[in-house]
Amino acid sequence: MTDDTEYRCSFCGKEHHQVDDLIAGPDVRICSECVVLSCEIVEDRRNEALAKQDAFIKRKQRSVLEGLPKPAEIYAFLDEYVIGQQKAKRDLSVAVYNHYKRLVSTKSESENEVELSKSNILLIGPTGCGKTYLAQTLARMLRVPFAVADATALTEAGYVGDDVENVLLKLLQDADFDITRAEAGIVCIDEIDKISRKADSPSITRDVSGEGVQQALLKILEGTAASVPLQGGKKHTQYEQASINTRNILFIVAGAFSGIEEIISSRIGRSNMGFGSDLLRKDTDVFDQILPEDLRKFGLIPEFIGRLPIVTAISHLDGEDMIRVLTEPKNALVKQYKRLFSLDGVSLGFDHEALEAIVELALKRKTGARALRSVMESILSPIMFDVPSRGDIESVRITAETVAGGGPHLTMRCARSNYIRSA
């Protein structure tokens, strides 16, 4: 004789004729009404858990945003290391702040929230004026992985040279191969002007190191899951690869764009009927008026330009700026060499005329501020060779005569003397 309980719902106790359906299992039955009720309970608990998770994410997001340096703080930090370039530092401070604010926001975005797009940066300015150094200083402040790549070393896939994904390999290496950290890093691609296409019109032949590289960089700049060859060089199926999502990587591309001044001047001169001559007295005045059409005429393809919505100019460094570069930043060269000499118990000083002479030599090399170190090394290297071996030197003073090839003025611990540099 069959037990009546076999025809009852194990949860509500209703008999099979009281419900639409009764689902049987091993030693248990559940009616259709209890199934619906169970689904509602599960959905309620799921929504409650999601609400708690969303509240936790928002609390964490607020905490991260509170710890994120504000644009004014980023600017102040850059000001300690970079001389001049006020507009560029201001533009970069805002752009970097918005980028990492977007990165934090993206982690808690729902389908109904506005999606924040990434804004990569194009830096334009003469060689040796701090384009790469600005990006490097930003990364150091934010403590994020950073990599610098030379655009001239890149080629289109299938040709001799590095694939564009090698740019990301350097970032991954700086992140100690932590992919999560690398995906929030900063990449600076220098010499981007060197991959401009050779003509204003689309190429009918393969331009593997120019337009081809621009095309290859498009997806990476916009955001894609890129396969990075861990061995470097070209991608190969036999080599191990890592997948990196570039959606949250900030790209800062930089270039001198020599000759673009004429393109801008020509456009402004036509549109202002001669008034442009008053506006173009300085390179910065020209660069501040740059438009996408100028970049296109220079040789960047429209799709590439579109992925660099923030364009800012780096101004040329004159003699006065170079002296400030030598002496004022937190890690100025003069301060570095003074520190080196102090480790040997010797003080180092520079006459203002000596600094002017050093800057004059550096300007002749036409490589901007990066020439300052090599000039300083050539002057101080013979002195740094002899001073550590002598215990009678109290101080060294560099004069204009020292820069011209003479010896520095030395203060001895017991008497004064002159150090004559050997030929």
UniProtKB/Swiss-Prot annotation:
Name the residues that bind ATP.
Answer: P126, T127, G128, C129, G130, K131, T132, Y133
Residues given in the record as Zn(2+) binding sites:
C9, C12, C31, C34
Supply the alphabetized keyword list: ATP-binding, Chaperone, Metal-binding, Nucleotide-binding, Zinc
Checking CDD domains in the record gives: RecA-like_ClpX
Give the highest taxon in the source lineage.
Answer: Bacteria
Q: Which residues form the ClpX-type ZB domain?
A: 1-50
List the GO cellular component terms.
Answer: HslUV protease complex
PANTHER family assigned: ATP-DEPENDENT CLP PROTEASE ATP-BINDING SUBUNIT CLPX-LIKE, MITOCHONDRIAL (PTHR48102:SF7), ATP-DEPENDENT CLP PROTEASE ATP-BINDING SUBUNIT CLPX-LIKE, MITOCHONDRIAL-RELATED (PTHR48102)
Name recorded for this polypeptide: ATP-dependent Clp protease ATP-binding subunit ClpX
